[in-house]
Amino acid sequence: MAAAIRHDWQHDELQALFDLPFPELLFRAAAVHREHFDPAQVQVSTLLSVKTGGCPEDCAYCPQAQRYNTGVNAQKLMETDAVLAKARQAKAAGASRFCMGAAWRSPKDRDIPKVAAMIAGVKALGLETCATLGMLSGGQARALKDAGLDYYNHNLDTAPDYYDSIIHTRQYQDRLDTLEHVRDAGLKTCCGGIVGMGETRAQRVGLLLALATLPAHPDSVPINKLVQVAGTPLHGSAELDPFEFVRMIAVARIVMPRSMVRLSAGREAMSDELQALCFVAGANSIFYGDKLLTTGNPESERDLALFARLGLQPMAVQVDAEGHDHGGTVHADISADAPGCGCAHAA
């Protein structure tokens, strides 16, 4: 019988999980995964930057911050037709969810109708919709919900006690407030963080504790591995031990058993073997395509080959224009013949 979903985890409990011998931790995580999901099914999503660069914030990892010299130039919000063309390509390539990211601190009210038109158009294609636009007011969240948005991404980024080492232009409470607005609007939440930014294991525990003790567990939990970009303050940071990354995936799966745990930014640099360990540990979602906002992602052909080697299949989903989920009725095609959320790190 599946264990009860908990929101009262304690730091020492999560620390004890992190500290388990690696084989024991993977065994426990895989067992929890099988209680709630088919371990051979992986959700496939595509992420598009609909407004790149020029962000006024100072997130130390982000090449889209205008204060850093990273070679990322500010661009205007894309036209709806161009976004829908990308969404059609993503669907043809096998994506079941289409995420749109904009490098804003928060959208202006005048931006919402433009984004709403993108959302409605993508939903009409039969794709799940996700957006990451920065901080939202309650009214903005409701407007996006009315347009047909399914998921909103807003990451916590790191543990509360490490946050001030990474970001100074937005408070941790600001992030929690946006998540509350998103939940109150009836949107599903996509919320995770980034590891490999110089934090300690105890602070990685702190990030997962913050996520697992939210009023509702995020529907999707993206775990990003820092992509170091020249010009950002975190460029040159020590690399995170790959096994530590797998531990992060495994503990996320155990404490948030019904959430989709997504391999997000940093996957381009991961070996097939490391990704396979992550799938065993409970990861069941990836971003598919060659770019995540402004950073690389594995080439589609590499993903196809890895899925074939591991016997994995894309998760089946079909969403109609009214937002009804008909999971299991249509299988996405990511065969090699198929045509080919915001900051640098994935939604």
From Swiss-Prot:
Binds 1 [4Fe-4S] cluster. The cluster is coordinated with 3 cysteines and an exchangeable S-adenosyl-L-methionine. Its cofactor is [4Fe-4S] cluster; [2Fe-2S] cluster. [4Fe-4S] cluster binds at C55, C59, C62. Its EC number is 2.8.1.6. InterPro entries: Aldolase_TIM (IPR013785), BATS_dom (IPR010722), Biotin_synth/BioAB (IPR002684), Biotin_synthase (IPR024177), Elp3/MiaA/NifB-like_rSAM (IPR006638), rSAM (IPR007197). Keywords: 2Fe-2S, 4Fe-4S, Biotin biosynthesis, Iron, Iron-sulfur, Metal-binding, S-adenosyl-L-methionine, Transferase. Pathway: Cofactor biosynthesis; biotin biosynthesis; biotin from 7,8-diaminononanoate: step 2/2. It comes from the Bacteria. Signal peptide: none annotated. GO terms for molecular function: 2 iron, 2 sulfur cluster binding; 4 iron, 4 sulfur cluster binding; biotin synthase activity; iron ion binding. SUPFAM superfamilies: Radical SAM enzymes. Residues 40-258 form the Radical SAM core domain. Transmembrane segments: none annotated. HAMAP family: BioB. Catalyzes the conversion of dethiobiotin (DTB) to biotin by the insertion of a sulfur atom into dethiobiotin via a radical-based mechanism. Belongs to the radical SAM superfamily. Biotin synthase family. This is Biotin synthase. It comes from Stenotrophomonas maltophilia (strain R551-3).
